[in-house]
Amino acid sequence: MKIGIVGLPNVGKSTLFNAITNAGAECANYPFCTIEPNVGVVPVPDERLDNLAKMYNPEKVTHAIIEFVDIAGLVKGASKGEGLGNKFLSHIREVDSIAQVVRCFEDPNVVHVDGSIDPIRDIDTINLELILADLETIDKRLERAKKNLKADKKYQAEIDVLQKIKEALEAGKTARSVELNEDESELIKDAFLLTIKPTLYIANVSEEQLADVENDKYINEVKELAAKENAEVIPLCIKIEEELASLDNDYDKKEMLEMLGLQESGLDKVIKSSYDLLGLMSFLTAGEPEVRAWTIKKGTKAPQAAGKIHSDIERGFIRAEVVSYDDLMREGSMNAVKEKGLLRSEGKDYIMQDGDIVLFRFNV
């Protein structure tokens, strides 16, 4: 699963990407220093794995992963090919969701592409370019569907959905703000609309702003806008996150977080929220060889989850032996879990839950 980090030039995208991945993407105080997108594979923080590792003492611990893609800074006119517009739009089309970095801090030493700080204007600039690109896609799709309608009436349903989305786009709204049922979503899935992608707003703030996020004018403006489209906002000071990421050990990181009065790093929040944004969760396998988190979509049934480990396990699925992480931690061992009758045997219709610890039984 891929999250595209987007934003106007000089808002802190590449610095955020560097901090998240420690990949050292070129970062400079001028537009377009990222042309080909940098891709970083990042482990999803999960303390459940650490606790299971203490219990099982495995040879290795494997976290779930998520990919972040640092996409070139966008400018007005991108939908018409301005700046790096065409490349930007093709790269953003390939990601599963969007993390939009918005500059909310004042600093005369860091030039703003529009000369002043206005997070709502910046969000509107990016959203407008994506909306214009989507309108072009919708118009082409409508034209084709109307031609096909003459031969097959089933295209009327597609036309109705496209028309509904077009009206929202023309009103300056994103496609994700349009309520669609499952059938409607399926009809336009292969249109690969940009503004239908789930979006997370990252408000890049100063250290001073971070100390009082509830009362910050810029952050509250972004939250208000995000609420209208059911998006989440995470305020973070990307400069602090860069410093934290450069520290070698967890003790130093913890000490710095305590000094700043923070429970966890903003990056951990971004990674976890990105995982949620994509409707993902983890089931766990635990034993002496390995403790591991496996990524699945929420609502996945047991046989399909088994297929994440190996296709043979899905094909020959018999049952899943399941205990919840909380039950195992409370009882302290798998033997105690079995004695209390907390180890369940689940069949092919069982819907997996986040934190299920599973042993799949199969026969091929």
What are these regions (language model features)?
Residues 353-358:
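Structural motif
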Residues 1-111, 120, 139-140, 145:
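Conserved G1/Walker A P-loop phosphate-binding module
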Residues 32, 46-49, 62-68, 82-95, ...:
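Amphipathic alpha-helical transducer elements in NTP-driven molecular machines
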Residues 74-80, 115-130, 149-154, 210-214, ...:
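Flexible beta-alpha connector loops of hexameric P-loop NTPases
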Residues 81-84, 113-116, 215-218, 248-250:
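Short, glycine/charged-enriched secondary-structure capping and boundary segments
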Residues 2-6, 17, 144-351, 363-364:
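C-terminal-of-GTPase-core extension/linker across diverse P-loop GTPases
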Residues 97-98, 105-133, 137-140, 196, ...:
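Switch/coupling subdomain of P-loop NTPase systems
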Residues 22-23, 48-49, 73-75, 103-109, ...:
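Conserved nucleotide-binding/hydrolysis micro-motifs of P-loop NTPases
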